[in-house]
Design a protein with these regions (language model features):
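A short glycine-rich, Lys/Arg-flanked "PGG" loop and its adjoining helix->strand segment in the class I
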Residues: 111-126
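A short acidic, Gly/Pro-enriched loop at the edge of an enzyme's catalytic core
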Residues: 86-98
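Conserved SAM-binding motif I beta-strand of class I
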Residues: 45-50
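Conserved SAM-binding strand-loop segment of SAM-dependent methyltransferases
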Residues: 68-85
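Conserved SAM-binding loop of SAM-dependent methyltransferases across substrates and taxa
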Residues: 30-42
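A short SAM/SAH-binding and catalytic strip from SAM-dependent methyltransferases
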Residues: 97-109
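Substrate-binding/catalytic lobe of Class I Rossmann-like enzymes that use SAM or dcSAM, i.e.
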Residues: 133-234, 243-246
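Conserved class I S-adenosyl-L-methionine
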Residues: 19-29
Length: 246
């Protein structure tokens, strides 16, 4: 998918990858960012962690497929939560870069999250985060119980773009922050939503019952409603690059 490739290329550029780093991806999803990095940078070494059993099982299957980029000996997978034991599990002061794509929305204690990252990074290391943000502060988006967001992303919130950029972290200095217009997300989601209904005869009722169809339809409606207002200026992505203080 070209849109995903463009997204990953931009993220790699903005985190200033040289291609020989030891990189840790927090909350790795199903490993598609890792696949891109391993295929693009032949000397990069990647570690990734997930707390999802389904994702871990899927990734392990991929790692056992010799034709898959994740079968590389430059990739390591960990299973667990992000907590006080994380640096013991993953390696203290080990990584040149620590990143996350679509994770920070579910982090309840941002300061503690960055303390964990501080323990994982080498001196002068850097950390990059890509997340959904709003341009302005929207109170109901800060409480997962107030919108459908919490139903699909447990504990999930949408922070205003300036929140992380202006946060005074003890061990980090902001290098640069970018607001990415949300209209491209809306266009992609709109196509997925159309494909969902255009192919309904293939999935209903054999693979999905009416309850699951309703669940996923509401998901698409929710996401499209987030990114469409003001032609993508109301909500989009925030991208943040920090350097660890010396």
């Amino acid at each position: 998918d070209q849109a995903q490739l463009d997204k990953f290329t931009l993220i790699a550029e903005r985190m200033k990858l040289q291609g020989d780093e030891k990189l840790l991806n927090l909350g790795c999803g199903f490993g598609y960012f890792e696949s891109f990095l391993l295929s693009t940078y032949p000397d990069i070494q990647i570690s990734s962690i997930t707390h999802s059993k389904d994702q871990h099982e899927f990734l392990t299957t991929r790692m056992n497929d010799s034709s898959d980029p994740l079968s590389s000996d430059r990739f390591q997978l960990y299973f667990g939560e992000l907590d006080s034991n994380t640096s013991t599990l993953l390696g203290k002061s080990k990584y040149d870069v620590v990143c996350s794509v679509g994770l920070v929305e579910q982090i309840k204690n941002i300061a503690l999250f960055f303390e964990i990252i501080n323990d994982l990074l080498i001196e002068n290391g850097r950390t990059f985060h890509h997340l959904i943000v709003s341009r302005d502060r929207i109170p109901q988006f800060l409480d997962p119980e107030e919108t459908l967001i919490g139903e699909y992303f447990p504990g999930g919130i949408i922070l205003p773009f300036s929140e992380i950029k202006n946060y005074k972290f003890e061990h980090f200095e902001i290098d640069e922050a970018w607001f990415v217009n949300g209209i491209n997300y809306w266009q992609t989601l709109n196509k997925w939503h159309a494909n969902f209904w255009n192919n309904m005869h293939l999935i209903y009722p054999e693979q999905m019952d009416s309850k699951r169809v309703d669940h996923w339809n509401k998901y698409f409606v929710l996401c499209k409603a987030i990114f469409r207002p003001e032609d993508g200026q109301a909500c989009g992505n925030g991208q943040y690059l920090f350097y660890k203080k010396s």
